[in-house]
From Swiss-Prot:
SMART domains: JAB_MPN (SM00232), SANT (SM00717). The keyword Zinc applies. Keywords: Activator, Chromatin regulator, DNA-binding, Hydrolase, Metal-binding, Metalloprotease, Nucleus, Protease, Transcription, Transcription regulation, Ubl conjugation pathway, Zinc. It comes from Danio rerio. This is Histone H2A deubiquitinase MYSM1.
């Protein structure tokens, strides 16, 4: 019995089925065939005649082997013909097709991975484990190519199923289409060829031919091979009747196979009585293989043409109106980066960018809206690339730049041919998203005859003038006489000097003083001493109180600060700022202003001073507190008086034809008759002396401050301070001035190489202080002279809260100059 055999031969015997009733014609005899040749479709009956000579036998054998290799792509068997009837067990050797055959488990994993990962072949290959990425892609290509063919085949009418199942021998033929026998676990099953056994053909009944799909690889289509593998194993080759336990599903599978075979063969009924009508000769096999290959090539070409046609995107026929409050599904697919849960790219941000671009298009319509024009209004909304992609998407769908000549709808893109063929809307959105990955193709720009850039279309239809060398030279001379072409570089603004001095305006009837300013003598003395000792600008803070009801600002104290040089300007040292603020806070005073010096020019603010003052005012006005600025000019050449010049100012904005401008306004400040705290004044004077005595930018206090004066800088400073203290008692004034002069003579002049003898020589042979001009000292000169401590300054209010460092003090000097001696 066939069901008791130990060998499974499911390749089928093609020659048995094709030959038909050859056994009855006494042409095909088993003793002439060995099992190795039984599966060869190219073996014909006449090749087995024993009367053929050995020489002809070898020629025919070689021809058959070559023909077999060409059509079946199998290794030719090396078994020779013999008249002995030997039953040899067919060795189960894997062919090239068998090596790529997929098991059911692998197919299930492939479908599972396809549903989970899509067309990510690398992940699917990792999921399967036994297949490479190339094998997965190759199988997927056949899978998707045959899938649409298998689905229509399943739609078989019930009438056809009934008519097919009603024929008893037909079921038996299908059950024997593949010989199912018991196998051991370690044996392979080759399902390359599936044909019915020759034992069934002796019944001489008209049946439909069961043939596999044409494939130049020699493999079955997955759906057909699956159907054959699901046939019941109880069927045998010798059994001519249908299995009573045959299920309805199996019949449906059979009908699918038959219907597909009928469609491909074109002849639903084949008479097995005439072998010449249904047997495949070599020419027919060649023709059949050529048809299969040409059909597959044609199908691939059609698919390629379809994909190429899909790449072309037509221009929108009408303008699209988008709802400003909703986001469509097409937008989510095309601009998916904003809908992936990223914290920096949210749907709200996409809506903001899209609506802004749409709004700009409505304003500029019908003028073309480019990407550059929308970027300034979308700051902090993402990188320019994502804004550009949204712009391109809106242009492609016709939401913006509709009917504009500059709009470009067909852009080059990378075609992903492995993508699933989804619905029309999804496919269009996918193509649209692919186009967004490529940048806009720029129009070609060329130079005209004058060398200027222009569009290539502008030069169309022009005739070029061919000039000789002499004419060209004359033309160039004429162009030179006309003058050079204006430069296309952006025009520079008018010369902007940050150190340009701006005269202060005065308050009057049109603009009254916002409050009155009273300055105590203590603050004026400290500012005057600090400004006299340095050739560069010095800087400090002002402390005082503000009476809101009376609108009176009283400046009670001045705290000198260090300065930091940045090459072009100097700023207040944040450490020293913080220290000065804390000292004023301990006294119960608030920071109500700042001061700096103009050593050798007018006490008018520069453009940079105005900007700094405006920043301070903006910072301190948040709490409702006023903030003023003071400028002290000790060595102004235009001032012949020994008294230093000072200005108290405030910056206010005024509207103008080109916008609002900031102008400085000068207060009419009043001096307070309140006596200063002498100990605090001497403390700050000591800080100034020990700070600047070794600085390169310190003023030599023993030199004359003017050519037409006999006063030294120290004497000039003492006279200026005396003028401030003229309302106080003479005793207090003299005591303080003697103490101050002693401090400078002992610790300032001695450290700079001065002595009493030198002072005497200075009086007899005066040396002038080297202030070159009335303009501000340049930054380079300031760095060279003041060692980076005193320069033109600007200070930011944001640095008032940093830490501070105290200067070193000489304890013996502090004791000798204490307030007790005064």
């Amino acid at each position: 019995m066939a069901d008791e055999l130990d060998v499974v031969d499911i390749e089928g015997d093609e020659c048995d089925e094709i030959v038909g009733d050859l056994s009855s014609a006494e042409i095909l005899q088993d003793q002439y065939l060995q099992s190795a040749w039984r599966t060869n479709s190219s073996v014909l009956p006449w090749t087995l005649d024993s009367s053929i000579s050995d020489e002809n036998r070898q020629v025919i054998e070689s021809m058959l082997l070559e023909e077999q290799y060409y059509f079946a792509s199998k290794k030719a068997p090396k078994v020779a013909w013999t008249n002995e009837k030997t039953k040899v067990k067919k060795p189960l050797v894997k062919s090239s097709a068998a090596q790529t055959r997929w098991a059911e488990e692998e197919k299930e994993l492939f479908e599972k991975g396809l549903a989970q990962f899509g067309r990510r072949w690398t992940k699917i290959a990792k999921l399967i484990g036994t297949r490479t990425v190339l094998q997965v892609k190759s199988y997927a290509k056949q899978y998707f190519k045959n899938k649409p063919k298998a689905e229509p085949a399943a739609e078989v009418t019930s009438a056809n199923v009934t008519s097919v199942s009603s024929i008893q021998p037909h079921v038996s033929a299908l059950t024997n289409a593949v010989r199912i026998e018991r196998l051991s676990d370690d044996e392979d099953v080759d399902i390359t060829d599936d044909f019915s056994d020759s034992e069934l053909q002796s019944k001489k009944q008209p049946e439909r031919s069961v043939s596999p799909d044409c494939n130049h690889h020699g493999e079955l289509r997955p759906s057909l091979s699956d159907a054959l593998l699901h046939l019941p194993s109880e069927s045998t080759a010798a059994d001519g009747q249908a299995d009573p336990d045959f299920s309805e599903d199996t019949e449906i599978h059979h009908s699918e196979i038959d219907s597909e075979a009928v469609e491909e063969s074109g002849n639903p009924f084949i008479n097995l009585d005439s072998p010449s009508k249904h047997s495949l000769t070599g020419e027919e096999e060649t023709e059949l293989a050529d048809k299969c290959e040409s059909a597959e090539c044609l199908e691939e070409e059609v698919e390629d043409q379809e994909e190429d046609e899909e790449e072309e995107l037509r221009a929108p026929e009408q303008e699209v109106e988008l709802d400003l409050n909703t986001i469509t599904e097409e937008e989510k697919q095309a601009i998916s980066e904003f809908f992936e849960g990223r914290p920096s790219k949210t749907p709200e941000r996409y809506l903001k960018i899209r609506n802004y671009i749409l709004d700009q298009w409505r304003r500029s319509k019908p003028k073309y809206l480019n990407k550059t024009s929308v970027r300034p209004g979308l700051k902090n909304c993402g990188d320019v690339n994502c804004i550009g992609r949204i712009h391109t998407y809106l242009e492609l769908i016709g939401a913006i730049n509709f009917n504009c000549d500059q709009a470009i709808y067909n852009r080059p893109r990378l075609v992903d041919r492995s993508r699933l063929k989804e619905s029309k809307d999804s496919l269009e959105a996918y193509h649209l998203a692919q186009r967004l990955q490529s940048m806009r193709t720029r129009k070609r720009r060329i130079r005209d005859v004058w060398g200027n850039w222009c569009d290539a279309k502008d030069l169309e239809g022009q005739t070029y003038e061919h000039l000789s060398a002499e004419e060209l030279a004359i033309r160039r001379e004429e162009m030179k006489k006309k003058g050079p072409r204006p430069s296309k570089l952006p025009k520079q603004r008018g010369s902007f000097d940050p150190f340009q001095l701006i005269p202060c305006k005065t308050f009057g009837e049109e603009r009254q003083e916002p409050y009155s300013v009273i300055v105590c003598a203590e603050a004026l003395i400290v500012m005057d001493i600090h400004a006299h000792v340095s050739m560069g600008e010095v800087i400090g803070l002002l402390g005082g109180t503000y009476e809101e009801e009376d609108k009176v600002l009283k400046i009670c104290s001045a705290e000198p600060c260090n300065s930091l040089s940045t090459g072009l300007q100097c700023e207040m040292d944040p450490v020293s700022q913080t220290q000065a603020s804390e000292v004023l806070g301990v006294k119960g005073l608030s920071v109500v202003g700042w001061y700096h010096s103009h050593p050798a020019f007018d006490p008018n603010p520069s453009l940079r001073d105005i900007d700094t003052q405006a920043k301070y005012q903006s910072y301190f006005s948040r709490g409702g507190a006023p903030f003023i600025g003071m400028i002290v000019s000790p060595y102004n050449p235009s001032n012949s008086s020994p008294q230093s010049q000072s200005t108290c100012l405030l910056v206010q904005e005024e509207p103008g034809p080109s916008g609002s401008h900031k102008f400085p306004y000068q207060f009419n400040m009043q001096c307070s008759a309140e006596p200063p705290d002498w100990s605090e004044v001497m403390r700050r004077a000591e800080w100034v002396v020990f700070k600047y005595r070794l600085c390169h930018g310190s003023v030599p206090m023993d030199r004359l401050f003017r050519r037409d004066s006999s006063l030294t800088c120290l004497e000039k400073m003492l006279l200026s301070i005396r003028t401030v203290l003229e309302r106080l008692s003479e005793v207090d004034i003299e005591t303080f001035l003697v103490q101050l002069e002693s401090l400078f003579n002992t610790h300032f002049l001695s450290e700079t190489g001065s002595s009493s003898t030198h002072l005497y020589e200075t009086a007899t042979q005066p040396q002038l202080l080297s202030f070159l001009s009335s303009e501000p000292i340049s930054s380079s000169a300031t760095e060279e002279t003041s060692d980076g401590h005193d320069e033109p300054n600007t200070t930011g209010p944001d640095k008032l809260e940093q830490s501070c460092v105290e200067e070193e003090h000489d304890e013996t000097v502090m004791q000798s100059t204490s307030a007790e001696t005064v």
